[in-house]
């Protein structure tokens, strides 16, 4: 039982395409000889490639359906992310094979998965991440066709999300790698050896197999409201709360110390995370940068509004918000130097905790306009969901905060149905490539099982004031008879949400 998300890379599957190719070439040659046909290389290769393509199709489909039909120990679908990065393999046949697997993954997601009524709908998992890079980002580049396919997929199914190789390499010392699940990023590799006994270890390039020890989140809105707008008091309280978070994180770390590899052999002994001996503890994997531990934060927007009286998109608010972020990073640096553990700052998504935090704030401080008057607080450093701002301005503004959130962060833009405007989707993707490390586009992908309506199912108030979902075509409000897919924070949610998150989804303004 493991908390959080795991990521796999299609680059690790790509080498097996050649294994299958050689197998089919041998089979075809044998079959042609058996029926008296001369097995020329051209004939053998053409038939073998048809079979390879069919196998890629079946293999990708199997991954998709296995992920959505599996259940974790707490009854959830596994939080799996699939990473699609062409430059992870050398140029040539291997990269072309990887491109073929990526292409099929995108085709399968565009198609969707069948529900009980036989209708293709948007699945929540696996989450897909597509890396924007020099040979796929502009028309005329070799893999531009994949980027166009990714844009089509995003417009219909809300994935993939996008990592800019160019920006990530600037921020991560020349490295580009996947996050762990939704948004949690490892620190740049500083390990001093092959601690995990990996069979493919490359010094300075260790990312797969590393992990996170846990996260504790600081509610910045509570710190602000507790200060009574006294700036000196705010910084004093922030340091006190940081110390509380530090002690909680150390408890998480100590809870893992002494854990024998036998508790989860597939993780610790068989190579998913490490290849430790039976009975060996995981302790050495908790230090020297092998794993990370996260200081989370939430509500920077409301914190700034309370302390400065303006949004953090205003110059005065931005200056204060960036100062808060730098203090949080300084704390992580202090703790890292003290313990040789990679503490890192993480933009907490608050999938459902947003409602709990908001209700606690209202109970403690009452309703404060623009601060505690919603049943949610804003995810990490994000611009408030109700604030009018263009997609490009939002991404550019948030990029400076993403740089200060090295342990994890993702930005998004809210867009209408873009299936008939893929040029606009591509324009946003190209802007992401040039300006921000990690971002996504949010659209709507819903289906009513009562009337067959496909479009946006609306959020309305019932007679008691509760937020409910309603089909605009037939008025159906039965959640068991509709399929609703919305971006919760980084993952796509399909199981509906609490009242706080539902209000946040309802109030999102379009950025494009």
Across the structure, where does each feature detected by a protein language model lie?
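Contiguous, well-ordered alpha-helical segments that form the cores/surfaces of helical PPI scaffolds
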Residues: 293-306, 326, 487
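Long insertion/accessory domains within large nucleic-acid-processing enzymes
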Residues: 473-512
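Glycine-centered flexibility sites
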Residues: 296-299, 407, 490, 500
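Short amphipathic alpha-helical segments with coiled-coil-like heptad repeat character
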Residues: 90-98, 308-312, 491-501, 505-507
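Conserved catalytic cores of very large enzyme subunits
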Residues: 1-289, 310, 314-473, 477, ...
